[in-house]
Design a protein with these regions (language model features):
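Extended, helix-rich structural scaffolds rather than catalytic motifs
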Residues: 3-181
Length: 181
C-alpha cells in the first residue's frame, strides 16, 4: 500500500513572518520530520509573510497537516490568554512573552517526539526513516536559515511554561475528537 502512495505537496493556510509568530517555522520542521514529511515555507513575490507547506506521502502528509494545525491552534489560544493577562504592559514585552511561549512549546514538542522515538527504538526496534520519494521530491527546496530576533530575546518563565506544555502535547486528543464529530 505504501509503495502505491503518491508524494503530495500540501500548502496550509498558516502564515508567519520574522516579526509575527516566527516559532511556526520551527514547529513545522519538527512535526514534519516526525510524520515522515518535509516542512517548508514559501513566500509570494513582494510579501514578507511566509506560508507553510509539507511534502510527504499521501497518508503521512494528511496526518502531519492535521497535527500541525492543531499544535499551532494550541499555541495561538494560549497566546491569546497571555495577551489578555498582560494587556497593561508595553506591546514589545507582551510580544516577547508570546514568542517565548511559542518557542518553548516548540522545544517541548521536539523533546516529546525525541522521547517517543527512543521508546519506539527500545521497545519495538522501530526507527522513523524519511521515504526516499519524499527526499527526492523535496530536493528543490532551499536550506535557507530562518532566523528571527525574537529567538535571541526570550523570556524565561514563559519559555519554560511553553516547554512544559509542549512535552504534554497529545495530538490524539484533538484528532480523536474530530473523528467522532
Amino acid at each position: 500500500d505504501v509503495e502505491k502512495q503518491q508524494v503530495k505537496d500540501v500548502r496550509t493556510d498558516i502564515t508567519c513572518s520574522k516579526r509575527r509568530d516566527p516559532w511556526i517555522v520551527s514547529l513545522s520542521a519538527i512535526i514534519g520530520e516526525n510524520y515522515c514529511c518535509k516542512g517548508y515555507r514559501y513566500r509570494r513575490y513582494g510579501e514578507q509573510t511566509n506560508c507553510i507547506g509539507f511534502i510527504g506521502l499521501e497518508d503521512d502528509v494528511e496526518i502531519c497537516v492535521a497535527v500541525f494545525k492543531y499544535a499551532v491552534d494550541c499555541v495561538l489560544s494560549e497566546i491569546k490568554n497571555i495577551k489578555k493577562e498582560n494587556a497593561c504592559y508595553y506591546s514589545d514585552y507582551v510580544k516577547r512573552l508570546c514568542n517565548s511561549y511559542g518557542y518553548g512549546f516548540t522545544a517541548g514538542v521536539s523533546e516529546a517526539f525525541r522521547k517517543q522515538q527512543e521508546e519506539n527504538e527500545q521497545g519495538w526496534g522501530l526507527v522513523l526513516v524519511m521515504p526516499k520519494e519524499v527526499e527526492e521530491a523535496s530536493q528543490h527546496l532551499g536550506h535557507e536559515q530562518f532566523q528571527s530576533r525574537a529567538q535571541k530575546h526570550l523570556q524565561g518563565s514563559e519559555y519554560y511554561r511553553g516547554f512544559e506544555e509542549g512535552t504534554e502535547f497529545d495530538p490524539t486528543k484533538r484528532l480523536g475528537e474530530e473523528a467522532t464529530v
